[in-house]
Regions:
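Fungal secretory targeting signals
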Residues: 1-20
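Active-/binding-site microenvironments in catalytic and ligand-binding cores
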Residues: 21-368
Length: 368
């Protein structure tokens, strides 16, 4: 691709992003309002806290508990591939170019040449992604409210032309300063539904739920039953919990690079229909256990469009993140863990310290 075409593409991407309406007054956005959220602050971690559940990493007992799960001295990575044909929510898209062939050189007596890459994307909210403090909020009469009572109008960092260039106190770098070292509990919902006789032996994934009661919704009772059935110790303070629904297998890291464009398009179609995942009762239960992180193999980890309480938009997101500062990792490759027989391990990862970003890409490691 010629550089002139490259930069036209970049500018077009940036221009499309600027089309979103920006509201600057200190008031609610048009649409639904929930002022119950105004009672959620201050956080249990203190009124000035910006890291939420990453504070569990400061507890040496949590690190010791995580490391105690390592029995075989083996490691796995559970991030998926970043690529233009991989699924993305809504308009989110990964675009990457190599500017120049090569980008620079040759230089010096050794005739050195090099390549760079240029990426345009929603860097914190694409493919395997971590949701940080600035990602999910609730519309209130005071304006959009995020973790620990921060109103977005008051948070924004602005640059030239008053353009918002960062989330200020809600930036993901605050979580990145601490990161996560936690005992990982892997819940295999596919095996569990099969054991109940609710899913065929040949099925690889839970169905997309459409209404309350569908088996694609994992409830609080289901979580507790899976822990017991898998012979695991109870989920406790500072633990991280991964849910395997099987839907992520459609573009798992072990198969994505061998898929052709038609297969990748089919995976994107499944991804766009909805997803099995946690019901709101499961998230409330996990919050009561004081966990550090939820994760799973789908785009949100919330069951949708069907959930236990209908009419809410990905309710675990606001219940866990906005209300409690318990963060969420999406599109994790749980298939790799299931194939290796990993039900428990040490999860180690930290988001990139992108100042003001809403989230972070990443490739976490699990030691077991």
């Amino acid at each position: 691709m010629k550089l002139s075409v490259l930069w036209v593409s970049v500018f077009a991407f940036l221009a499309s992003a600027s089309l979103a309406q920006e509201v600057t007054q200190h008031s609610a956005l048009k649409g639904p309002i929930d002022d119950n959220a105004l009672t959620w602050a201050p956080s249990k971690w203190g009124k000035e806290d910006r890291a939420g559940s990453a504070n569990h990493t400061l507890n040496s007992a949590n690190i010791a508990k995580a490391l105690a799960t390592i029995k075989k001295n083996k490691a796995l990575t559970i991030g998926k591939h970043y690529h233009s044909e991989a699924p993305g929510f809504g308009p989110r898209k990964w675009n990457m170019w190599i500017p120049g062939t090569p980008t620079g050189g040759p230089f010096g007596k050794n005739a050195l040449v090099y390549h760079d890459e240029l990426v345009t994307t929603q860097i914190g909210q694409i493919q395997t992604q971590f949701d940080g403090p600035g990602h999910i909020g609730v519309n209130t009469t005071k304006g959009p409210m995020f973790y620990n009572g921060v109103i977005s109008w008051d948070a924004y960092e602005r640059g030239a032309g008053n353009q918002v260039i960062g989330m200020g106190p809600l930036g993901v770098e605050h979580v990145g300063e601490l990161g996560f070292v936690c005992r990982l509990v892997v819940l295999d919902a596919v095996a569990y539904r099969k054991s109940q006789g609710k899913l065929s032996a040949a099925a690889e994934m839970l169905p997309i739920p459409k209404q309350p009661g569908d088996i694609g919704i994992v409830t609080a009772d289901d979580v507790q039953a899976m822990v017991k059935a898998q012979g695991l110790k109870e989920i406790g303070s500072g633990d991280c919990v991964a849910l395997h629904t099987g839907q992520g297998n459609t573009w798992g890291a072990t198969r994505y690079k061998s898929m052709n464009s038609e297969q990748r398009a089919a995976a994107r179609a499944i991804f766009a229909e909805g997803e099995p995942g946690f019901g709101i009762s499961a998230c409330r239960y996990l919050a009561s256990r004081d966990i550090a992180l939820t994760m799973g193999d789908t785009s949100a980890n919330d069951a949708q469009p069907g959930n236990e309480e209908m009419g809410y938009a990905v309710p675990c997101h606001s219940e866990m993140q906005t209300r409690r500062g318990i963060w969420n990792f999406e599109n994790v490759d749980t298939e790799t863990l299931i194939k290796a027989g990993v039900q428990e391990g040490a999860f180690i990862w930290a988001p990139l310290k992108i100042i003001g970003a809403t989230g972070s890409p990443g490739n976490p490691m699990v030691l077991y």
